[in-house]
Amino acid sequence: MNQVRKWNIIGGRVIKTGIAVFLTVLVCEFFNIPTIFAVITAIVTIEPTATDSIKKGLVRFPASTIGSAYAMTFTFFLGHQALSYALAAMFTIVTCQKLRLHAGTLVATLTAVAMIPITADHYFTAFLIRLATTSTGIIVSTVVNFFILPPHYVKTISGCTEELFVKTANVMEEWLTALMDGKVIKKETTYNLSKLTVLLHKAVQFVQYEQKDWKYHRHTKKEMRSFLLVQKQLHLLQQIIYHIDNLARAPIETCDWSQNEKEILRRTIHSIISILRNYCEKIDEEHFKLIDELDKQFWTNKNDLAHCKPNQYHHHFSSESIILFEVLSIHDMLEELKQIFEKYESENQLNCSVH
């Protein structure tokens, strides 16, 4: 994973931006129209997905039209004054926001203020030329984004998912160390947990990108199954990270475990860490035995707490019960992850035997 990041200096989106700019300039030169506005539009129209390029392109065109119209109107009445720039920018922003052309506001405003100093006369002609250049930039960028190196995020999503499994296990290991020492978790562990959440959100965003362009590309059944697998894995990993976050907030220092209880918990969490590092492909019988022991321990803690008088203890759960509940909840997620992986493998084998 790290090797891929090391050598992937120029991404597909950067290459496509360069190609879009190059082709836009060629088209503008062929039709003998100014290039600068077309190039600006082409650069900002390259989006993470082809769908976004089309949708935002349809927003940016009317937005740029509004910006050009305001620029020419204020220049005609006020000339090349500071007030012309200010009014053109302000009116463009307000109009775009009122018409909900949010994706085109920046390009429209840049177009408006950039047109003023280079237009001395023939305002209506200049306005029409801006429409032509804006259209050129949008069309070229959309075509490039659609046909040249079309966005595919499946491999990236799979890589992020694998990384999430490993880093989730690492954070659990750090938390276990704090638990065994009976100390508050370190700031480093909290930081790693927040980074884990960021990585999860990044992976989910890539899934959304892939879904947007799914209808535009052909996929084999195996690719579709693989994509559905990582989607489900991410959903369950999100829940696991939520439970780990709860563990990180649990008051470890107030826990009072017996030596046997502590040992069972330690072995169970070690088993969970091992399962996560193997991407939940297998759960052995020893792990289930540990979970049974932990489950008994949880209900014993809960029943003991029920006998406490209100003036002795006013919470529904003790620190020990909270930790046991979260660990057992994580185990439930691991079982689900194992089941969906087994289903994925069996479907692949069935598909291979049919062919």
UniProtKB/Swiss-Prot annotation:
Chain segments annotated as transmembrane: 19-39, 74-94, 109-129, 131-151
Gene Ontology, cellular component aspect: plasma membrane
UniProt entry tagged with the keyword Transmembrane: yes
Organism expressing this protein natively: Bacillus thuringiensis (strain Al Hakam)
Name the UniProt record assigns to this protein: UPF0421 protein BALH_2468
Subcellular location: Cell membrane
Superkingdom, natural source: Bacteria
Keyword list, A-Z: Cell membrane, Membrane, Transmembrane, Transmembrane helix
Main localisation: membrane
Homology family: Belongs to the UPF0421 family.
Membrane topology label: Multi-pass membrane protein
